[in-house]
């Protein structure tokens, strides 16, 4: 097929029957062996592995210091916890933050302020991916200032 014909076929001006030469409708069907793929029982599908680990994040909005126990139990089980202290009195909120700081220190986790009076507690070996532009170049196409 010449280049003009290819261009015309690409634009849809002529029919492209070039592919029909290569297809054979009369192909021989082979005997199916009946063997199926056998997977190793130790191999697991990625979605099954994620469900087994129980990836979840706990959110707690405590009313008083008595709710600190629930925060501690979630964090002790390896669940990252978001604590929203906006509904608490400032003195009780300070006590909860002190408790959370001790909890994260004792279990080798981290505590991070996400917003005003909102904190994120992450257990050890948990990675936090930030959406900030720290790693992006400051100049380039997207810098239109």
Curated annotation (Swiss-Prot):
Q: Which UniProt keywords apply?
A: Cell cycle, Cell division, Cytoplasm, Septation
Subcellular location per UniProt equals: Cytoplasm
Q: Per its UniProt record, what InterPro entries does this chain match?
A: Cell_div_SepF (IPR023052), Cell_div_SepF/SepF-rel (IPR007561), SepF-like_sf (IPR038594)
Q: Which Pfam families match?
A: SepF
Q: Does the keyword Endoplasmic reticulum apply?
A: no
**BP-aspect Gene Ontology terms:** division septum assembly; FtsZ-dependent cytokinesis
Assembly and binders: Homodimer. Interacts with FtsZ.
State the protein's purpose.
Cell division protein that is part of the divisome complex and is recruited early to the Z-ring. Probably stimulates Z-ring formation, perhaps through the cross-linking of FtsZ protofilaments. Its function overlaps with FtsA.
Similarity field: Belongs to the SepF family.
* PANTHER family per record: CELL DIVISION PROTEIN SEPF
- What HAMAP family does the database record attribute to this sequence? SepF (MF_01197)
**Any idea what this protein is called?**
Cell division protein SepF 3
The beginning of the lineage is: Bacteria, Bacillati, Actinomycetota, Actinomycetes, Kitasatosporales
Q: Which gene encodes it?
A: sepF3
């Amino acid at each position: 097929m010449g280049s003009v014909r290819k261009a015309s076929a690409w634009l849809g001006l002529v029919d492209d029957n070039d592919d029909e030469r290569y297809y054979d409708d009369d192909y021989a069907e082979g005997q199916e062996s009946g063997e199926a793929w056998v997977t190793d029982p130790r191999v697991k599908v990625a979605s099954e592995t994620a469900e087994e680990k129980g990836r979840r994040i706990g959110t707690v909005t405590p009313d008083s210091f008595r709710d600190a126990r629930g925060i501690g139990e979630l964090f002790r089980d390896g669940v990252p916890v978001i604590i929203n202290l906006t509904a608490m009195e400032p003195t009780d909120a300070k006590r909860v933050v002190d408790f959370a700081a001790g909890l994260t220190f004792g279990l080798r986790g981290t505590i991070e302020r996400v917003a005003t009076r909102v904190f994120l507690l992450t257990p050890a070996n948990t990675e936090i991916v930030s959406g900030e532009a720290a790693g992006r170049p400051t100049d380039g196409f997207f810098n239109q200032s």
